[in-house]
Amino acid sequence: MFPMQFTNSAYRQMEPMFAPGSRGQVQPYRPRTKRRQEPQVGNAAITALANQMSALQLQVAGLAGQARVDRRGPRRVQKNKQKKKNSSNGEKPKEKKKKQKQQEKKGSGGEKVKKTRNRPGKEVRISVKCARQSTFPVYHEGAISGYAVLIGSRVFKPAHVKGKIDHPELADIKFQVAEDMDLEAAAYPKSMRDQAAEPATMMDRVYNWEYGTIRVEDNVIIDASGRGKPGDSGRAITDNSGKVVGIVLGGGPDGRRTRLSVIGFDKKMKAREIAYSDAIPWTRAPALLLLPMVIVCTYNSNTFDCSKPSCQDCCITAEPEKAMTMLKDNLNDPNYWDLLIAVTTCGSARRKRAVSTSPAAFYDTQILAAHAAASPYRAYCPDCDGTACISPIAIDEVVSSGSDHVLRMRVGSQSGVTAKGGAAGETSLRYLGRDGKVHAADNTRLVVRTTAKCDVLQATGHYILANCPVGQSLTVAATLDGTRHQCTTVFEHQVTEKFTRERSKGHHLSDMTKKCTRFSTTPKKSALYLVDVYDALPISVEISTVVTCSDSQCTVRVPPGTTVKFDKKCKSADSATVTFTSDSQTFTCEEPVLTAASITQGKPHLRSAMLPSGGKEVKARIPFPFPPETATCRVSVAPLPSITYEESDVLLAGTAKYPVLLTTRNLGFHSNATSEWIQGKYLRRIPVTPQGIELTWGNNAPMHFWSSVRYASGDADAYPWELLVYHTKHHPEYAWAFVGVACGLLAIAACMFACACSRVRYSLVANTFNSNPPPLTALTAALCCIPGARADQPYLDIIAYLWTNSKVAFGLQFAAPVACVLIITYALRHCRLCCKSFLGVRGWSALLVILAYVQSCKSYEHTVVVPMDPRAPSYEAVINRNGYDPLKLTISVNFTVISPTTALEYWTCAGVPIVEPPHVGCCTSVSCPSDLSTLHAFTGKAVSDVHCDVHTNVYPLLWGAAHCFCSTENTQVSAVAATVSEFCAQDSERAEAFSVHSSSVTAEVLVTLGEVVTAVHVYVDGVTSARGTDLKIVAGPITTDYSPFDRKVVRIGEEVYNYDWPPYGAGRPGTFGDIQARSTNYVKPNDLYGDIGIEVLQPTNDHVHVAYTYTTSGLLRWLQDAPKPLSVTAPHGCKISANPLLALDCGVGAVPMSINIPDAKFTRKLKDPKPSALKCVVDSCEYGVDYGGAATITYEGHEAGKCGIHSLTPGVPLRTSVVEVVAGANTVKTTFSSPTPEVALEVEICSAIVKCAGECTPPKEHVVATRPRHGSDPGGYISGPAMRWAGGIVGTLVVLFLILAVIYCVVKKCRSKRIRIVKS
């Protein structure tokens, strides 16, 4: 195969050169001659061909600049017909012909009649021809690297195509490179406008290009021809009218299709890039010395093109020995795939037209035909419908990822292959019969079953892919030539799914995707998609199937391509083992005794653990159709439930068609995470806390809710019984505590009053009125005469009252200000001594300079502490400076990032046992090798936990594959080791154990001053100084270094877990870490540690096998009861990123900020508005709702200007704004948030303050989807009526207590002076 390919236009240019006759002669018809057989290509022939190709390339390069020759051949001259003369009217022939055409186009009514064209193929050819006229090759270092296309008024080419356009007028033009796409454009000379193509809009339909059709659907461009290659970058994509809709950039495989990356255009020449992530730019590298590239394989010291060997020597059906030798000699060649396809398909010069022209279907046919390089085999099956047997469909291995239901099985037969090894239908099965011959059967009714019938997805060669339900055994059954065969083996099929949020089957109606692992069904040309085959083992057959004897004449029937071997003993000769390889042979033997017949296939087959160990030399490699790969899988997104609010709860209701996971977590320090699988009809009530809660329904985006203010039945502004109902529902603990204390005090007061009354009635009788009461009584009486003092009285009135009534209290109140005045006067008295050096001309001059400098650099500083919660409302403030217009300031947290410092200790995955086929020593002893890694099954694999045992007294007198005739002298070597599963190379199937040392916390804060936005990055370990537009911002450090990650974490797929994993080298069977490695070579790690509990057992004597047990994968067991991932349990609402390992948007901590605003940012007021006569009316109010209150403020403005409006009351935010003030009456309507049923806030407008007060109604909704700006009700609020009732009750109790205390004192005093009355 030569690398140089001619396009159609090149052929057209070279037609005159290759034509045998001149242009004016008629060329006779030449029938197709038989294709000449190609001679064997040697080194001398390759050199000669290289020289010829170099000369031919130079000739073609010279022809490229010449004028284009009409491709139409000479017209055939019609004999016996004279040429028509010109008409007598004197018209020229051209004018007459033009006139006739115009008349033909017009109908009877003068309308143009358009001919219908039923030749779509011709339209395609015309469009491609038009595209060729506007397409020019681009040469780079002597080779075509791509193409450039003239479209509209510009010439376009991909930016990755280097070189000059092969046209004198376009060679030196300068291109402009697009910023956001792989495209270059330039203007071309006006003389070439006739060659430019018209643009058209690329839509979802089928288009044309050089090699066939291109299908566009949902921004996915598929090359239906599959013939695109390097060097095609820049080729035009046209519609049937010849208009260009795009140019090709490159392509790549997408399953069985070829997907393209293109630049699409529209009618206005606007370009857009439709990229495919796995596409490779189709630019061609420069040729090296213009020599053809030949992919070389070797055979008998001769080199040849791997994809085109001489079919006389290579065809595996004609010369199987030569073909197998050729495959064996080129096993390590990187182009072995091409050689394998060539020797098994044996393509001729003319192929039969296939029904399906799909490249994928043709490629599948080649893959099936490649199985002709191997033969099927028979192996031991432990259960063939109740008994053990040697079965043609014996199950050798079963592979499962453990995370889904798909199984990959390997059997001894070959699916989709004919008896000779060619490609067959899906129901065909190639197998090795009991007679040692290879057969093929159609309509085999292949069935795979576990606990129920499996869905067979695909069967290629020895491998079957099926979707099976879980079970403890696996059965494969097929009908072969009318006989039903089945094989059952023990296999524990369990599905251990990783963390998932939905368990759907077929409900993938969304565009959401995620990385997943599956078995690849698209073979690729790489070593990963090949499997080794070894020398075939002999199978035992009955002697009558291969030898027939008549008296002393015996005939041996040898199946084609096999070797027959048996023991022969004649009458007068000793016993001997004879071998026959030809088709039919005859020998003479008197009284023959023929035993131990066996047939060995000439072609190799796969190594099987159910057969004894055979040859160790790899004979060939055949396709391995289903290796695991990481793919992008679509996932379902469950419909959201109906969400309603009831008090401070969220109600979810609906019907789930399949299991959906509902997870909740609080957004505070204690996440209190919950998870529940829901299916069918459901109704769930979820309480919402003031800190917030996060709900995640299936694969939908998380939803956040906050409880605003809880409310209750009853009335907070009514009588005591309604107050009791309200507060009992709202704050039951406080309400019942208050009722209990009040009842207790009343009971105590009542008891004391009763006791006092019973004692006083005797004292009053014995004592007369005391005109000089004791001082305590007088003092108690004087308390009633003390004037009351209100808290809202002026300070001077209070001082005057204290001076009049209590000199001691006055002195205490006056001591602090007097001390302050004394300190100030003392400092002023000594000020002259401190400032003496500054008095004078120098001092005053320096002072003036400092004052001037300070005045020039003066700025305004605003400080604030911002909570580090991106979900929190932004901080808003109005900056009021005397003499300047107000400025609005907004600060919000854009995101937070917690980045831990990690170290990968090891990775783990599913461990599997690898078994060396049994080494059987018949009538002799065998032993384990000193280096177990030299065993063939362990070669090329990373192994650990290797066990090798020698078993004696095995297989006594066993006939079959072992051929042991001894009873007790037979021995067997059994070797088993642990290795990594083939799924370990996929990221989603591998768990990584990290140790976390420290974490860095970063946040981005957006500061908006007026219309200017400044982004500041703040850190936990220092102060950040940033400058915006005339702003200087000093922020940080963040007040906490909180991290949701523990010291040990595990990452698997897209989830992260806090888990205390075992150290490296300390794994135990069946637990996390039973397979450990640190190497980045996941297929063959050189530091593998494994312990899967392998135990080698004594084999039973019914068949040759290796008996062992092991523990199932510890990773799969850990996934069964794994803790919840951090994406569910992380506190503070952290979002967890697995790769890289980060925690995002954690709502914890705060950051102090200082913002220096220069005077230049402020606008000086020319006149102060001086608002006066302020009045505020609360129009409406709902408490517990963001900006649920509305207020109207009226005031009089003395001058026009600007004023900032904001709230001075903590906990009652006002929608801050800057208002325009006009001279005269002004009205401002604003909103505020109130957390309580009664609101009283002070509003400041340009240093004028007005008080707004009113009553609020309960909110309609008590759960909100955004974090409220007002403070949540902590439970300590008591309404005004409740306070008055409570104050009245408490005051009454206090008065009663004081009265009782006075009575008690009076009684006590009276008792001390009472007169005892003695009856006479």
From Swiss-Prot:
Residues 954-971 are annotated as: E1 fusion peptide loop. The chain crosses the membrane at residues 735-755, 808-828, 837-857, 1287-1307. The keyword Protein transport does not apply. Disulfide bonds join 297-306, 381-487, 384-389, 454-468, 516-633, 909-984, 922-964, 923-966, 928-948, 1134-1146, 1176-1252, 1181-1256, 1203-1246. A lipid is attached at residue 1310 (S-stearoyl cysteine). Residues 101-135 are annotated as: Binding to the viral RNA. The record marks 207, 240 as: Involved in dimerization of the capsid protein. GO terms for biological process: fusion of virus membrane with host endosome membrane; proteolysis; symbiont entry into host cell; symbiont-mediated suppression of host toll-like receptor signaling pathway; virion attachment to host cell. A lipid is attached at residues 784-785 (S-palmitoyl cysteine). It comes from the Viruses. Structural polyprotein: Specific enzymatic cleavages in vivo yield mature proteins. Capsid protein is auto-cleaved during polyprotein translation, unmasking a signal peptide at the N-terminus of the precursor of E3/E2. The remaining polyprotein is then targeted to the host endoplasmic reticulum, where host signal peptidase cleaves it into pE2, 6K and E1 proteins. pE2 is further processed to mature E3 and E2 by host furin in trans-Golgi vesicle. Residues 48-81 are annotated as: Host transcription inhibition. One of its GO terms (molecular function) is RNA binding. Gene3D superfamilies: 1.10.287.2230, 2.60.40.350, Alphavirus E2 glycoprotein, A domain (2.60.40.3200), Alphavirus E2 glycoprotein, domain B (2.60.40.4310), Alphavirus E2 glycoprotein, domain C (2.60.40.2400), Tick-borne Encephalitis virus Glycoprotein, domain 1 (2.60.98.10), Trypsin-like serine proteases (2.40.10.10). Residues 120-134 are annotated as: Ribosome-binding. Residues 283-302 are annotated as: Functions as an uncleaved signal peptide for the precursor of protein E3/E2. It catalyses: Autocatalytic release of the core protein from the N-terminus of the togavirus structural polyprotein by hydrolysis of a -Trp-|-Ser- bond. This is Structural polyprotein. It comes from Alphavirus salmon subtype 1 (SAV1). The lineage of its organism: Viruses, Riboviria, Orthornavirae, Kitrinoviricota, Alsuviricetes.
